[in-house]
């Protein structure tokens, strides 16, 4: 009877957390879909330029994700322990860090957009469109970090549904404004890439306003001004111990992952366009593993923080098994969606052929992505075991994938699909190493004081 009750609780918790988080991630990914299809419907170069320009926000998110991951790891454990004072302190610390990061990226994008675009492409037309986008979108980068902190607090405090609702409303507003500003409507002239940037900015303002408003409802954690200017040395040290390795891993992974777009950008506009569409489809399908990963981190973290180490370990083992099933489902979704996307997207014949080949590579990539995301980000992260991600990425991505892609792009003139496959090999090659580390159970740890 005890086993049945345990299974029921596990499944109920998993679905309660996974579905709203997956919906939230899906809604966020749909913004990229809207940008790609609406801009791509006007001009392939619009789509490619925005895809490259948003790599700047991707880099910003590496820093923000380190702060919010520290908030999620410690927050989930202290919520399990029901220590609200510690939660307030951690929340304020994350807000301070995200605020500094947001200002730095705003300045870079607002005042030096052309230099940033030159990192990703040498095509003048893509650079010009990207600069137009960044000059407006840079203002939204001021707000993103604050919103993410509020969203994470909702997730770990049993309000994942509210977080999903906020994201859904924001995305719907973004998509509607995209249609109005990109194409032109209600007396507004077509703004193409500038319209996409303006829609993003307005939706970010709405997202932050909704997040702050919900935080004042009973049962929610809100930012307390006095905590914003106070400092708990012990919690700050714990936060840095969790976030430091995550930031290192984010930089190792994020800079490497961004370089993948650089390789495609330097292989011509057709390759860049195919990569833009493939990235959008990949991100949508990966919402499934991201949802399970986030749910795993919260569920296991709650148990570990409450002192239930045995149950937390059992949850982790089940999540590891689930990661393979999730990967198989994602592979099927990739294979099924490929012909549908190819039918609707507007590309040159060469870009369409490239895209077909990239989809084939991604079908195999999904297994590795699922296993590593759920086990490393979810299970390992729940107990503060955050170092593995950084050094495994340093070896598989920077030691194998990137050197191969650099050689193929700049020296050996390999076909686009071969270079793209090189950028995906790290996720597959890392699986055995991840499973060996999992069996050491270093992640079964109570981090609370």
Residue ranges of model-derived segments:
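Short alpha-helical transmembrane segments in multi-pass integral membrane proteins
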Residues: 1-21, 75-142, 188-244, 300-366, ...
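N-terminal transmembrane alpha-helices
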Residues: 6-37, 41-42, 55-70, 74, ...
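Short runs within selected transmembrane alpha-helices of multi-pass transporters and secretion channels
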Residues: 68, 137-156, 163-174, 196-212, ...
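Transmembrane alpha-helix boundary and packing residues in multipass membrane permease domains
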Residues: 21, 25, 36-37, 54, ...
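Residue-level hotspots within pore-lining transmembrane alpha-helices
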Residues: 27, 31, 60-64, 104, ...
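Small-residue-rich hydrophobic transmembrane alpha-helices
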Residues: 47-110, 144-163, 261, 274-338, ...
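Transmembrane helical elements of multi-pass membrane transporters/channels
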Residues: 16-35, 136, 170, 203-207, ...
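Helix-terminus/linker motif at the lipid-water interface of multi-pass membrane proteins
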Residues: 26, 30-48, 117-124, 180-191, ...
């Amino acid at each position: 009877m005890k086993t049945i009750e345990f299974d029921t609780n596990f499944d109920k918790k998993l679905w309660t957390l996974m579905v709203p988080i997956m919906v939230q991630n899906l809604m966020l990914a749909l913004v990229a879909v809207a940008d790609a299809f609406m801009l791509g419907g006007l001009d392939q170069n619009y789509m490619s330029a925005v895809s490259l320009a948003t790599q700047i926000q991707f880099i910003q998110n590496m820093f923000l994700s380190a702060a919010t991951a520290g908030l999620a790891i410690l927050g989930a454990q202290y919520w399990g322990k029901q220590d609200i004072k510690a939660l307030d302190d951690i929340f304020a610390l994350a807000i301070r860090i995200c605020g500094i990061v947001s200002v730095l990226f705003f300045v870079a994008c607002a005042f030096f957009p052309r230099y940033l675009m030159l990192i990703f492409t040498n095509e003048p037309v893509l650079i010009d469109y990207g600069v137009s986008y960044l000059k407006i979108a840079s203002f939204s980068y001021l707000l993103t970090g604050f919103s993410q902190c509020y969203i994470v607090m909702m997730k770990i405090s049993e309000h994942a549904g509210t977080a999903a609702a906020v994201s859904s409303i924001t995305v719907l507003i973004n998509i509607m404004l995209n249609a109005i500003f990109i194409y032109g409507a209600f007396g507004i002239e077509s703004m193409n890439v500038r319209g996409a940037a303006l829609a993003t900015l307005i939706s970010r303002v709405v997202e932050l306003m909704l997040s702050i408003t919900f935080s004042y409802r009973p049962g929610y954690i809100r930012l307390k001004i006095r905590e914003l200017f106070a400092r708990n040395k012990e919690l700050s040290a714990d936060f840095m111990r969790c976030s430091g390795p995550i930031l290192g891993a984010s930089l190792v992974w994020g800079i490497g992952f961004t370089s993948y777009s650089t390789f495609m950008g330097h292989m011509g506009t057709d390759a860049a366009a195919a990569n833009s569409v493939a990235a959008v489809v990949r991100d949508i399908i990966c919402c499934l593993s991201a949802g399970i990963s986030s749910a795993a981190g919260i569920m296991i973290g709650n148990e570990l923080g409450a002192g239930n180490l045995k149950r937390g370990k059992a949850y982790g083992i089940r999540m590891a098994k689930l990661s393979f099933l999730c990967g198989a489902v994602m592979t099927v979704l990739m294979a099924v969606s490929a012909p549908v996307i190819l039918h609707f997207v507007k590309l040159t014949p060469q870009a369409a052929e490239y895209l077909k080949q990239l989809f084939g590579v991604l079908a195999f990539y999904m297994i590795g992505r699922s296993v590593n995301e759920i086990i490393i980000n979810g299970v390992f992260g729940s107990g503060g075991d955050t170092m593995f991600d950084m050094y495994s990425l340093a070896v598989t991505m920077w030691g194998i994938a990137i050197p191969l892609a650099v050689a193929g792009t700049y020296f050996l003139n390999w076909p686009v699909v071969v270079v793209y496959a090189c950028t995906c090999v790290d996720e597959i090659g890392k699986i055995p190493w991840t499973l060996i580390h999992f069996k050491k159970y270093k992640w079964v740890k109570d981090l609370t004081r």
